[in-house]
Every structure is written in structure tokens, then in C-alpha cells.
Amino acid sequence: MIGVIDYGMGNLFSVSKALERVGVPYVVSDRPEELEKADAFILPGVGSFSDAMDNLRRAKLDQFIHRMVDEGKLLLGICLGMQLIFEESTENGSAKGLGLLAGKAVRLKDRDAEGNKLKVPHMGWNRLTFHQTSPLLSEAEEGFVYFVHSYYIDGMEDGDLLASAEYGVRVPAVVGKRNVFGAQFHPEKSGTAGMAILTQFTKMAAEQQVKK
């Protein structure tokens, strides 16, 4: 079963519908005692980084996430949820994240290297470029996926970068280290390429459960 972490800022409907299409059981909750029954977790999110962290802390979901990751359960952060798994964000000054991966969220540049103007927030389809092999990407292709964001991860460890896209800068699109993963785009809104990644995440969770 997949636990979808509800902290008041997630795109819960589209993630839930995507999991229904995959055909896996799931629970959506803001209560650790309900979520801990799950085999793996999805941390969705839209909105302000600092508000999101405040909500997680208020519900003690930050502590819960750390405990589940320490126990070896899989975590997938989506969009803002991916940014939250890193150390900090420069949005509205500075805000501390969950610190599961090294790096920080910084605002996208509004000009590319040639000085051409770019729209921020970035909303649209961009092609993935894979950098490393990973079980999460084993059934996916370097197709187009759908982004909606104003911030991207900078200063991360090269070994944690699984796939990127280009939007003025190299945007980390899929990240992963041990049992912690993130997707800056919305896999649940990204057609075949996105659903392949989401489906594989659920398969990884099922395989991990069988091994126990």
C-alpha cells in the first residue's frame, strides 16, 4: 500500500487518481498512525516551501518521514515535495527542509545563457535526459514530462541526479539516493513517461515488501 502524505498543500486528487490507474491500494492521511501502515510514501506538494515545512512540523509529519526513511521505506517527493526532501530553500529568505538529500531550492532564472527571456514560473513540457541507471527509471524513456515550478534544486550531489531537463539551466528532474526519490515534474500529469515512473515506484515498494 502507498501512503500519500496530506499536509494541506498537496495535489492529492491527481495523485490519487494516478494510483487508481496503476491499480495499487493507497491511503491519503495527515495522521502518522494511519500512514505508517503503508509500504512506501508519496509526498506531493504545491505552494510555498516555508508554509509546507510549517505544516509538516505542526502535524509532526517531518519526524514521521524521517522515521519511515530510517526504517528503509521508500519515499517519493513530487514537485514541491521533491524540494522539501533537500536541505533548504531560498524562497522568502531561507527555510530549512527535511535534509534527506544535500542541496537547496533556488529561483529559476528569467534569462537563458543567450539573454533570451524565460517565463517564471516554468509551466510546460520538457524532455528528460537520463544521467544514471536506477530502478525508478528502468521502465521509462527520455520523453516529455510536465513541469509547474518557480524553483529548482542547486548544489546537489552529482551521484543523486538521475535525470534532468533544460530551462535556462539544468533542472534536476528526477533525484534519488538509497530509498529517497524525487520528481520535480508531475508524473501523474505527464502521460506515458510519467506513469511509467509512478508505476515503477509502486513495483519497487511491492518488491521491497516481499523481501521482508
Curated annotation (Swiss-Prot):
CDD domains: GATase1_IGP_Synthase. GO terms for cellular component: cytoplasm. One of its GO terms (molecular function) is imidazoleglycerol-phosphate synthase activity. SUPFAM superfamilies: Class I glutamine amidotransferase-like. Residues 1-211 form the Glutamine amidotransferase type-1 domain. It is found in: Cytoplasm. It holds the Pfam family GATase. This is Imidazole glycerol phosphate synthase subunit HisH. It comes from Bacillus velezensis (strain DSM 23117 / BGSC 10A6 / LMG 26770 / FZB42) (Bacillus amyloliquefaciens subsp. plantarum).
